[in-house]
Amino acid sequence: MTTPRPVIVGTGIAGLWTAWRLASEGQATVVVTKESLADSASAWAQGGIAVALGPGDSPSQHAADTLAASDGLADPEAVRILTSEGPSRVYELLALGARFDRGPDGRLRLGLEAAHTRPRIIHAGGDRTGAALIGCLAQVVRCHPLIELLEHTEVVRLVDEGDRVTGVAVLPGSGAGYVLRASAVVLATGGVGQLYAVTTNPRVATADGWALAHHVGAQLRDIEFLQFHPTALKLPGVNPAPLVSEAVRGAGALLVDRTGRRFALETDARGELAPRDMVARAVAVADATGGAWLDARGIADFPAVFPGITAMLARHRLDPLHDLIPVAPALHYAMGGVLTDLQGRSTRPGLWAAGEVASTGVHGANRLASNSLLEGLVFADRAGRALATDLRAQSSPPVSGGPETAIQRDTGADAASEPILAEMRELMTANVGLQRSEGSLLHAEQELTRLAGATPLDAWRTHNQLLVARLITTAARRRRESRGGHRRSDYPPAALKRETA
């Protein structure tokens, strides 16, 4: 007989921080990830953490910028929590050994990014912030005696008994599947980028968390709001698309068309530093009418400030000091997700969520640059503390976990269904992308239903992705307005409502 422990699904910044917080509260924890610990979108983050630490800045100013970027949909209280608790989380990261970039005076170097009114972005290793932070937290998690790590172990479904989630059915890389009983399950599975043909997300970002939550009746919110990063390196057929960080534009790079015209200025007076949804649409228009390029030739210290991007560009025979960089938008981030309260509880008892998979209300219709890692830290911390408190207040009898014959096995049907997924990605990009309409969304719904009908029943991974694609499409069709990351050609921007689809 074993006492059930909290199970955390995912090892991005939200998953690792939740595990560390629970363990620091004395709570033994299990962390499950379908690949290795380092395989997450967090580890790929080139941008930094937005936090109000500089002179003339404040959490209230950071909150104002966040609310302005959200296009009227962010929850002011969630945003207040995000920006006011952020500095404490950064200081905790420093105490754990994280090393952020500093200036000659020894102070944290603060960068400027789109739609921020103050320089407040801290970086680690120039453009390798995510890798540096995940490396630090991974070491903490691997060494902690209260944290058990199950790598290369896939969560097939949530175990839902009675009125609550009580565990996860898992499928290891080798061996039989089994049920892992849990005192609570925390989803920290990241985003949905692999539902699209062009994305900056790693291949593990297959919308698992949304599908798992939906299957047990947890509410999803604002899933129609998807952010397309304006400056992915344009390399047709490459998945994932290499990212050229927002920080490059913050350092002075310009967006130009084939004539050298700064087209972003025609969309918004802030030009390259306008909110991402505006810049992405401007880049898409330029790309469709001759091409869009990022001109970083004026950044003399580019290789020193952006070593990772410099190396990536060199692999594609581009030198940012001499060449224009061809760019195009790519699916980057999901603003909505599993609806949670401000402590990470979903609408289904026993199920929690943190990070990109969750909808806390901090992003609204459009995320402010570099608020994603911050959200992962702040709300994972709140979830860990609240869950530890809840577990101390309750007493549950030991239960046993073991093999369960109903767990899906890997029959190879998903591999055989790859052509279906490829068609789904192209369909979503063409019809549920930066520009949508009633006609495109209806077409996508019909085609996704057809693809689901053509998919073998035992291809459960494929069915989960098709399910989430249909949910996103339906939510987008029901939201009859244009706002933030959701733009409909048949509903031009006008008076905005607060209701969500």
Stretches with model-predicted labels:
Residues 7-9, 180-189:
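Short hydrophobic core segments
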Residues 95-177, 188, 232-235:
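Conserved redox-cofactor binding core of oxidoreductases
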Residues 74-87, 121-139, 150, 199-207, ...:
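Short beta-strand to alpha-helix junction loop
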Residues 184-238, 242, 371-379:
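Glycine-rich loop(s) and the adjacent beta-strand/alpha-helix scaffold that form part
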Residues 15:
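N-terminal Rossmann-fold NAD(P) dinucleotide-binding loop
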Residues 1-5, 21, 25-27, 36-37, ...:
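Glycine- and aromatic-enriched mobile tails/lids
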Residues 35-67, 71, 238:
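Conserved N-terminal glycine-rich FAD pyrophosphate-binding loop of Rossmann-like flavoproteins
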Residues 37, 212, 218-325, 386-392:
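An anion/pyrophosphate-binding glycine-rich loop and adjacent beta-alpha core
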